[in-house]
Amino acid sequence: MAELFWFEKYRPRSFDEVVDLEEVKARLREFVRGGNMPHLLFYGPPGTGKTTMALVLARELYGEYWRENTLELNASDERGINVIRERVKEFARTAPVGKAPFKLVILDEADNMTSDAQQALRRIMEMYAQNTRFILLANYVSRIIDPIISRCAVFRFSPMPRSLMAERLRHIAKSEGIELRDDAIDLIYEVSEGDMRKAINLLQVAAATSKVVDANAVASATTMIRPADVVELFNLAFNGDVTKAREKLRELMYVKGIAGIDFIRAFQRELIRMPLDDEVKAEIAELLAEVDYRLTQGSDEELQLLYLLSKLGAIGKRARQTPPPSKRR
């Protein structure tokens, strides 16, 4: 049997297990206590807990009968609004199991539906409002038509803060017998950008080959440059060995497939930790910002990165010729 994805394995099953979204939880708890609720619209970036919260709400509403009373649909997977209409019709024609006054339809990626399909969805929501409630999940609320928004209680889901993501990742690592280093958490958070699903999946991939997960293990699990490679490339350029630095750069670009912008982000991340004078760090930071801007404007990646290495060599040469601040007086 294939190993369960950790994201599913550690998906919260109750409001108490959800480590974020306190305001959302408070309002949804009121619906559960009252035994009734309007249609709901959850929107926000991927991996911010929309599906998880919808399923938690179903469990809290229906208890052991939550599966019988819940229909999950994906607007992107279904073959048009007619299929959704027929499935909802079939689902809604029977009474809820247990004491619940209504059934629940969870429709993911609702913002991928056309305006015409959303108009049809609005009519479906009205048609079965007596015994069915809808939870619509969307990345972008701006892509949902106003007539649907006006019929829903709207909840915004934000990326998870670093502190809470770190807490959750440490819990999972401990449960799986994994030693999770702080630098790995930093890199996972940077790569995932607060997307908890992506963060947990990345942790699982990084842990597949080692019981100790550090930043290098995380980088190896992605197309990101490893911190060790960043330091090596920087030291080669900064110490004047531009030829080897170019060879290393081309290896990382064309063998490992590292993108130009990822080099810049990696240099910026490692620069903070490097044992350099503040003046030198400031000069390098300005250089990185310059190259970053050129890359965003569509300049050739290799040429810009070679320029970066050349300038790092010049900065390193000046730094070696300049006495430290304490000896300048």
From Swiss-Prot:
Superkingdom of the organism of origin: Archaea
Residues binding ATP, per UniProt: G44, P45, P46, G47, T48, G49, K50, T51
Annotated Gene Ontology cellular components are:
DNA replication factor C complex
**UniProt KW Nucleotide-binding keyword:** yes
Q: Name one GO biological process term.
A: DNA repair
Q: Name one GO molecular function term.
A: ATP hydrolysis activity
- Looking at the keywords, is Nucleotide-binding present? yes
Q: What keywords appear on the UniProt entry?
A: ATP-binding, DNA replication, Nucleotide-binding
Q: What does the record note on quaternary structure?
A: Heteromultimer composed of small subunits (RfcS) and large subunits (RfcL).
Query: Function of this protein?
Result: Part of the RFC clamp loader complex which loads the PCNA sliding clamp onto DNA.
- Family membership: Belongs to the activator 1 small subunits family. RfcS subfamily.
Protein's name according to its UniProt entry: Replication factor C small subunit 1
